[in-house]
């Protein structure tokens, strides 16, 4: 049976891991990397994913998609500001959803994320020697129901059976606590590329119990990058009266340079940013260059408000868990953005202790997801591990006056089920519309509507007489199911809160088929490249033989050279039939050449080789002074 894997589907980078010998291990990708950039590029009919997509981004900014996790499961009115700063086109889709336009085609964020998942799983399957079908995928703890469901759908589009969707900080705690003994209260501080979570857990005797979670799904490393982008663009505009952010290619280069500068400033007090030929003067068409120095102090000044936003979720998580900073035994840092020195200082200041850096912030989440996958599959090496997680946001229904009536409050342990009785507001009311909400505000309009459904056929009766039983049921993935039943008549209606990103079952099935078709095309392209590379390697071998065997018969050398030249032409043509013919011919000529040469060598008089060896013995190694 193929093992299930754990996947950290990140904003900036993604990681895949598996249980091996009782320990979670990261699976390297085809390029040998432990992390894979969450970047997808569309180049003609070809889809590039990972490092290869990232490398060509500056030349193909409109069709190179990154940080798509910031749009997954979101509605257009939630992401308009973030969409405006992307080098690619993000726009409103059906029913207020988000779509990304590439080469005239509209893509759902789930489709793009599915390409990253497919790359991870394909590479891992090749490494493990088994096709992977089952996975645990992580999400930020503060992801709402829509975002969780959209992530699960991305896995489905990628051809995966998603065993569980679990919270990233909880997964990191699993990786941290797997081999630790004794009881601890741990605060996981997870600042990734696009999201921020704080989770407090109690660990002990194989039980991982989440006490509280808080966060901000609009805060991450990319926000720090864009502060540098805006500063660089502003400085350039002052000097040249031209806004680089209006040039997609220049904007892509700015984003890449900003990320590099941010990383440099984690280890240096100052860094240089050099972008030659960043654009051209619109009037004279002469090239323009950008050269700037950025100090760590200036970077902290540019991001001061972002750094302040880091504090509140930590304080809220402590308050919700009814703990003080002194009750925390360890602080675990997760996510690449926790390497920012100012972030580390804030954490230390808030909790009063130096963070534990024993876990790799880039890999801990995937490792923990692999542990969860092992638990689900019954991996005996893990023993009796129990994971108790919570729902991050309050769930409720809209009631008279536009208020929200909470059903399941935030930080309730999941799975969870709650039933409440509601009634009608008017005499002889034939039905009710139930608006399912998620959020912490008292008014329904200020919270996120997850879905609406109707319960009809209520018998005529005075206002307040009908008894409508509403049940909220959250599963282990944090996905919500709601039912409503009128007790007198027995009429019942229900809704599973999914399809909140306007991807219905038909959409998902179509995308799965497209993904499978792409997979077949990708396989064909890979096989074609391998055949071309094999022929080219054989050609190089033939050329080496010609150089090494100068004394071979001239007609044999001529035939081999002609076959090698034909192979070189076939490689350049990319014509499958030419490549196959050239491969066959070159193999035959090379085999014939080497056989003839070997026979010639064996047929030499015995003394010839001995004399050659004697001549070698007479050679004296010496260092000669070069001629003046």
UniProtKB/Swiss-Prot annotation:
Signal peptide positions on this chain: none
Keyword line: ATP-binding, Chaperone, Nucleotide-binding, Phosphoprotein, Stress response
Keyword set includes Nucleotide-binding: yes
Biased composition (Basic and acidic residues): 555-591, 614-628
Modified residues (Phosphothreonine): 195
Reported induction: By stress conditions e.g. heat shock.
Family matches, as InterPro entries: ATPase_NBD (IPR043129), Chaperone_DnaK (IPR012725), Heat_shock_70_CS (IPR018181), HSP70_peptide-bd_sf (IPR029047), Hsp_70_fam (IPR013126)
Matching PROSITE patterns: HSP70_1, HSP70_2, HSP70_3
Source organism superkingdom: Bacteria
Comp. bias regions, Polar residues: 594-612
UniProt region (Disordered), positions on chain: 547-628
ATP-binding in keyword set: yes
MF (Gene Ontology): ATP binding; ATP hydrolysis activity; ATP-dependent protein folding chaperone; heat shock protein binding; protein folding chaperone; unfolded protein binding
Cross-referenced SUPFAM superfamilies: Actin-like ATPase domain, Heat shock protein 70kD (HSP70), peptide-binding domain
GO biological process: chaperone cofactor-dependent protein refolding; protein refolding
Family per record: Belongs to the heat shock protein 70 family.
Function: Acts as a chaperone.
Record PANTHER family: HEAT SHOCK PROTEIN 70KDA
Protein name as it appears in the record: Chaperone protein DnaK
The organism of origin for this protein: Deinococcus radiodurans (strain ATCC 13939 / DSM 20539 / JCM 16871 / CCUG 27074 / LMG 4051 / NBRC 15346 / NCIMB 9279 / VKM B-1422 / R1)
Record gene name: dnaK
């Amino acid at each position: 049976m193929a093992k299930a894997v754990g996947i950290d589907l990140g904003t900036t980078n993604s990681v895949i891991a598996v249980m091996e010998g009782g320990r979670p291990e990261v699976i390297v990708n085809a390029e040998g990397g432990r992390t894979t950039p969450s970047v997808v590029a569309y180049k003609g009919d070809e889809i590039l994913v990972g490092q290869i997509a990232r490398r060509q981004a500056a030349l193909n900014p409109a069709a190179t998609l990154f940080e798509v996790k910031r749009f997954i499961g979101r509605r257009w009115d939630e992401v308009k500001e973030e969409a405006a700063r992307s080098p690619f086109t993000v726009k409103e889709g059906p029913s207020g959803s988000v779509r990304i336009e590439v080469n005239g085609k509209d893509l759902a964020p789930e489709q793009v994320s599915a390409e990253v998942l497919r790359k991870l799983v394909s590479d891992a399957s090749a490494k493990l020697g088994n096709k992977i079908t089952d996975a645990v995928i992580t999400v930020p703890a503060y992801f709402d129901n829509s975002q969780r469901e959209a992530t699960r759908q991305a896995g489905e589009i990628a051809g995966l059976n998603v065993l569980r969707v679990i919270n990233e900080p909880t997964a990191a705690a699993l990786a941290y606590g797997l081999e630790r003994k004794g009881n601890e209260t741990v605060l996981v501080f997870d600042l990734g590329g696009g999201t921020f979570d704080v989770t407090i857990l109690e660990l002990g005797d194989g039980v991982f119990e989440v006490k509280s979670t808080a966060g901000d799904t609009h805060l991450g490393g990319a926000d720090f990058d864009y502060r540098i982008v805006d500063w660089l663009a502003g400085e350039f505009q002052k000097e040249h009266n031209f806004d680089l952010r209006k040039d997609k290619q220049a904007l892509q280069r700015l984003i890449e340079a900003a990320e590099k500068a941010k990383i440099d400033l984690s280890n240096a007090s100052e860094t240089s940013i050099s972008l030659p030929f960043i654009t051209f003067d619109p009037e004279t068409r002469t090239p323009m260059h950008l050269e700037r120095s950025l100090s760590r102090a200036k970077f902290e000044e540019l991001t001061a408000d972002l750094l302040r936003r880091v504090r509140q979720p930590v304080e809220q998580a402590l308050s919700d868990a009814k703990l003080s900073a002194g009750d925390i035994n360890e602080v675990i840092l997760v996510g690449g953005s926790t390497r920012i020195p100012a972030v580390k200082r804030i954490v230390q200041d808030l909790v009063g202790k130096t963070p534990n850096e024993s876990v790799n912030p880039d890999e801990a989440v995937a490792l923990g997801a692999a542990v969860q996958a092992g638990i689900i599959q019954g991996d005996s090496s893990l023993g009796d591990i129990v994971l108790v997680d919570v729902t991050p946001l309050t769930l409720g229904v809209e009631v008279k006056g536009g208020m929200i009536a909470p059903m399941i409050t935030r930080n309730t342990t999941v799975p969870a089920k709650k039933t409440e009785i509601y009634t009608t507001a008017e005499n002889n009311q034939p039905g009710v519309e139930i608006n399912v909400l998620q959020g912490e505000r008292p008014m329904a309009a200020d919270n996120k509507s997850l879905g609406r459904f109707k319960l009809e056929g209520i018998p005529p009766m005075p206002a307040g007489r009908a008894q409508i039983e509403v049940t909220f049921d959250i599963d282990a993935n944090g996905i919500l199911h709601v039912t409503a039943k009128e007790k007198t008549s027995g009429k019942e209606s229900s809704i599973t809160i999914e399809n909140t990103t306007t991807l219905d079952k038909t959409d998902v099935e179509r995308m799965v088929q497209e993904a499978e078709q792409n997979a077949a095309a990708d396989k064909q392209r890979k096989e074609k490249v391998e055949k071309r590379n094999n022929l080219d390697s054989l050609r190089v071998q033939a050329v080496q033989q010609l150089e090494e065997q100068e004394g071979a018969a001239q007609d044999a050398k001529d035939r081999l050279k002609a076959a090698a030249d034909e192979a070189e032409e076939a490689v350049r043509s990319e014509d499958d039939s030419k490549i196959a013919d050239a491969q066959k011919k070159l193999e035959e000529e090379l085999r014939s050449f080497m056989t003839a040469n070997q026979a010639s060598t064996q047929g030499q008089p015995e003394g010839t080789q001995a004399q050659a060896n004697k001549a070698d013995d007479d050679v004296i190694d010496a260092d000669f002074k070069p001629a003046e």
